[in-house]
Amino acid sequence: MRSPLMILAVLCVFFCAAAAGSSVTAEEKLVPGSQVACEVKVKSGGKDVTMRYWRFVPKGYNGKKSFPLMLFLHGAGERGDNLEVVKKWGPPKLVRKRKDFPFVVISPQCPRGTWWKVEGLYQLVNHVAGSLRIDRQRMYVTGLSMGGFGSWHLMDRYPKLFAAGVPICGGGKADSAKNLVGIPIWAFHGDADGVVKADLSRVMIKEIEKAGGKKARLTLYPGVGHNSWSRAYANEDVYKWLLSHKSGGGKTGGGRK
């Protein structure tokens, strides 16, 4: 007769192995045309942080052809630990019906009470680009409200990371314009936005142009308040415009100090 300790040891080995196996499956198993919850360890503010995110892989992905990548950054209202709320707006909402959406979409969640940390986002992009067949010359960033600010900041900090960006109802630092002159940017804002003033987008485009940039543009929606993202993300021309841009090699190493 086996001792209780031996039985306990065998059970521990079995369940630990099963748990490890399920973890690997959740992260590595790909179901084209679906959006799955994932997580990755990143360094942020000198600490190890677990970043949770949605990962959408389009129908037709088979690991042979490289696909464009889109990073989506949500607004302040979707922060927290309930990943489902990230699918409320934008690309993660869109792909629930658009199984053939022509991008791999990654939609991380920002913890409650914090703001987007670009170092962690940079690591997330590199993690996904290194684990899937991603066209590194076609990586894009977009976000709304707080995510619009995050998009501007990320492009400023890592100007060679993305081929183009679509910041919506956000804003950046005017003195960062010199770092953005080479990036195609299509910003959107409602001119009646009472939460994030449209002047924040106007100033960024103006400063980029003053610095010599010719690739930035702004669409203002007359009479529209803070929610300019519903119109922007419903515009098919946005996705065609993104796909029309390629970076000069998709270099992801190192950012601006």
Question: Residues of each region from the PLM?
Answer:
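Short, proline-enriched alpha-helix->beta-strand connector loops that line the catalytic pocket
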Residues: 101, 180-185
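Bacterial N-terminal signal peptides
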Residues: 8-18
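Primarily recognizes the serine-hydrolase "nucleophile elbow" in alpha/beta-hydrolase
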Residues: 130-131, 137-181
